[in-house]
């Protein structure tokens, strides 16, 4: 009973962070299962495992996207690492609003249940994660499935907005003495920018899906041309949220990678201020490029020219970050421990994803590539090998701090190599499929595409072996037989750590700081 009360009513940022991690792991496993079902269906031409039920295929696609985005990456990155480490890194005793933190988490399980219900009632919600009308309208999806998905989004959106308010307040008001804004660790900066993006973009999504809800149930015509509405309005509203959302997913990863590259190169991050302002620029520009998802809906040519140019400009701050990471490693004594492997893998694969993004930014090219597997390849390189690699990197980097036990290094490296090989084998062939015109979200395809699809499906099976490896690592780390206690700083940073988390014991006390730490200097590494 005491344990139940501790976890149910917890107001401790570390406990809530741990809950977010557990939740993210569960949702991630579900999302992975759906993705494997998708790849099994696409392994060869013709109907494979779904018996010709093509609506079910689209339900799988939709559920896979929602699970991975709203219930895996966001809870783990912002809720997990954010809650665990933002207060510690800024020298705060806890979050600004501990009970708000609790409700932010507990809104997510009901939201997840609503999402799963939407896949299970009637014929499910086969709209894709974009939920475009008229397909999501009452005529095309007559049951309650889409309504359940909308309520699910509302709940997880409220959760994220409350969490954002909490992070913004905490970072602005609860920094320890001497912790100026320009001394904040980069992970804290990344969470701050992310919180602002969430706060500004989610209300727009809420408005769009509420209008969709009334269109479906109360006979309004916001998105119905018959009553003077316009389905393109929905697309504008959705992508005004949807584009900042993809930066919300990757920015905390940028912060994690900066910490890891710095630690394992044995030198401070190259161009700290440049890194900070690059993240802020990405955040601002992220709101100015949404219509590049809509080049095929008949936008004016001048509009397309603007969105092409603006999208390419986002590559500049992103490039600054990539080159700063490389410059940080340049001339350092690099240790290739598991977190560093994932970080280097992140930089390499995220760069490939970014380059295909530059290709897609060209409105002329995008008209040919829109809704093909080229787009799927692009955003999976950014997410499946960007956000997810950053999550794994952060896990291996901080797992000793969180649990107070060290992970098995060899097994961690095996996990990295299997995953690296698997995800590349899955998503690289998709570029070729897209360039030869294979459309997204279609469960069958001409025989000409069979070769690359077979390879891609094989890669996804390898990735699953990698995930299993990861859970073996977690099990071994947490098992009672693991006597390898973790030092306050497992990466030997006691003398020259530039961040606070390595100054406290592993795991940190229930109340991290007996007295607030005073920060004198954050830049120098003692050699």
From Swiss-Prot:
Cofactor descriptive note: Binds 2 heme A groups non-covalently per subunit.
Annotated binding of Ca(2+), by residue: 41, 46, 443
InterPro entries: Cyt_c_oxase-like_su1_dom (IPR023616), Cyt_c_oxase-like_su1_sf (IPR036927), Cyt_C_Oxase_1 (IPR000883), Cyt_c_Oxase_su1_BS (IPR023615), Cyt_c_oxase_su1_dom (IPR033944), Cyt_c_oxidase_su1_bac (IPR014241)
Required cofactor names: heme; Cu cation
Oligomer and partners: Component of the cytochrome c oxidase (complex IV, CIV), a multisubunit enzyme composed of a catalytic core of 3 subunits and several supernumerary subunits. The complex exists as a monomer or a dimer and forms supercomplexes (SCs) in the inner mitochondrial membrane with ubiquinol-cytochrome c oxidoreductase (cytochrome b-c1 complex, complex III, CIII).
Classification via NCBIfam families: CtaD_CoxA (TIGR02891)
Protein name from the UniProt record: Cytochrome c oxidase subunit 1
Source species: Arabidopsis thaliana (Mouse-ear cress)
Taxonomic lineage: Eukaryota, Viridiplantae, Streptophyta, Embryophyta, Tracheophyta
UniProt gene name: COX1
């Amino acid at each position: 009973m005491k344990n139940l009360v501790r976890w149910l009513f917890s107001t401790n940022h570390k406990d809530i962070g741990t809950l977010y991690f557990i939740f993210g792991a569960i949702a991630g496993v579900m999302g992975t299962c759906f993705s494997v079902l998708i790849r099994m269906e696409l392994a060869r031409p013709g109907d494979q495992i779904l018996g010709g039920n093509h609506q079910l295929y689209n339900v799988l696609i939709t559920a896979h996207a929602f699970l991975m985005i709203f219930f895996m990456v966001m809870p783990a990155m912002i809720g997990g690492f954010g809650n665990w480490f933002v207060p510690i890194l800024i020298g705060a005793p806890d979050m600004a609003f501990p009970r708000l933190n609790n409700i932010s988490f507990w809104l997510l399980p009901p939201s997840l249940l609503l999402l799963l219900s939407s896949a299970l009632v009637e014929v499910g919600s086969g709209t894709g994660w974009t939920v475009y009308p008229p397909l999501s309208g009452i005529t095309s999806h007559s049951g309650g499935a889409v309504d359940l998905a909308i309520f699910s989004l509302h709940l997880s959106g409220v959760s994220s907005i409350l969490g954002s308010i909490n992070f913004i307040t905490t970072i602005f008001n609860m920094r320890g003495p001497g912790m100026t804004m320009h001394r904040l660790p980069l992970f804290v900066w990344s969470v701050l920018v992310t919180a602002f993006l969430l706060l500004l973009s989610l209300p727009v999504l809420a408005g769009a899906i509420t209008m969709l809800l009334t269109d479906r149930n109360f006979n309004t015509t916001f998105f119905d041309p018959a009553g003077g509405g316009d389905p393109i309005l929905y697309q504008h509203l959705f992508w005004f949220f949807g584009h900042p959302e993809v930066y919300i997913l990757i920015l905390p990863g940028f912060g994690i990678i900066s910490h890891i590259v710095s630690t394992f190169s044995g030198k401070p991050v190259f161009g700290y201020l440049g890194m900070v302002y690059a993240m802020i620029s990405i955040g601002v520009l992220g709101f100015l490029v949404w219509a590049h998802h809509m080049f095929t809906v008949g936008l004016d040519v001048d509009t397309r020219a603007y969105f092409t140019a603006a999208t390419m400009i986002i590559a500049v701050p992103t490039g600054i970050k990539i080159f700063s990471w490389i410059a940080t490693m340049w001339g350092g004594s690099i240790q290739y421990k598991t977190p560093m492997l994932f970080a280097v893998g992140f930089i390499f694969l995220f760069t490939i994803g970014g380059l295909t993004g530059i290709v897609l930014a060209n409105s002329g090219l995008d008209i040919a590539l829109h809704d093909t597997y080229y787009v799927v390849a692009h955003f999976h390189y950014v997410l499946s090998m960007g956000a997810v690699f950053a999550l794994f990197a952060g896990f291996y980097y901080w797992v000793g701090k969180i649990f107070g036990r060290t992970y098995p290094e060899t097994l961690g490296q095996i996990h990295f190599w299997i995953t690296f090989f698997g995800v590349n084998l899955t998503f690289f062939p998709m570029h070729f499929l897209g360039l030869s015109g294979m459309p997204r979200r279609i469960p069958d395809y001409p025989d000409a595409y069979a070769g690359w699809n077979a390879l891609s499906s094989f890669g996804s099976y390898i990735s699953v072996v990698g995930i299993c490896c990861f859970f073996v690592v977690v099990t071994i780390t947490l098992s009672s037989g693991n006597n390898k206690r973790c030092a306050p700083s497992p990466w030997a940073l006691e003398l020259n750590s530039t961040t606070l988390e390595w100054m406290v014991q592993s795991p940190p006390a229930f109340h991290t700081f007996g007295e607030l730490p005073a920060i004198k200097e954050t830049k120098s590494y003692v050699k």
